[in-house]
Amino acid sequence: MSQTRVDFYQLSRDPVDVTVAKLARKVLQAGERLVVVSEDEGQRTRLSKVLWEQGGAAFLANGMADSPHAARQPILLSANCDAPNEARMAMIVDGRWRDEALAFDRVLLMFDAAQRDAAADLWRRFAKDDAIDNRINKQDENGTWREGR
């Protein structure tokens, strides 16, 4: 049985849009496709704009999961965990876990201080499940994310 890796990211220094852009770039550099999940349509629209406006050739091409040609996009923004672009990675940016995300090889779960207790409960649940490899990532004072405990 293969494991799903779930990386927990507590947003404390940088806002979600900055963190999404940094991590999405790394996903693409690794040759992967990505689904960015948020129930909030306004958040999805803002994130799409941020990804496109990265500057020059460094922009991050993306589209909405319900748009034409979604399958061609390296990054999709979606209200759910569907992946018409055949992504094996998902980034949940509204802090609300969805069990459907366990179908991906890897999931990045972002949460803020208000969602810390729910994330801690989820961490404890996953720690008991051999099918899940859960890890915590912490941001240092320079904005670099590092795996921590």
Language-model regions: role of each:
Residues 1-45:
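Long, hydrophobic N-terminal alpha-helical segment
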Residues 12, 37-41, 92-96, 111-113:
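Structural motif
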Residues 23-26, 50-55, 107-108, 123-127:
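Short, solvent-exposed amphipathic alpha-helical segments in soluble enzyme
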Residues 33-35, 87-90, 105-109:
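Hydrophobic beta-strand segments of well-ordered beta-sheets in folded domains
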Residues 43-50, 118:
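Phosphate- and divalent-cation-binding pockets in alpha/beta enzyme and binding domains
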Residues 49-88:
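Helix-adjacent hinge/juxtasegments
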Residues 83-103:
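SF2 helicase motor core recognition
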Residues 105-149:
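Glycine-rich, aromatic-bearing surface loops/beta-hairpins
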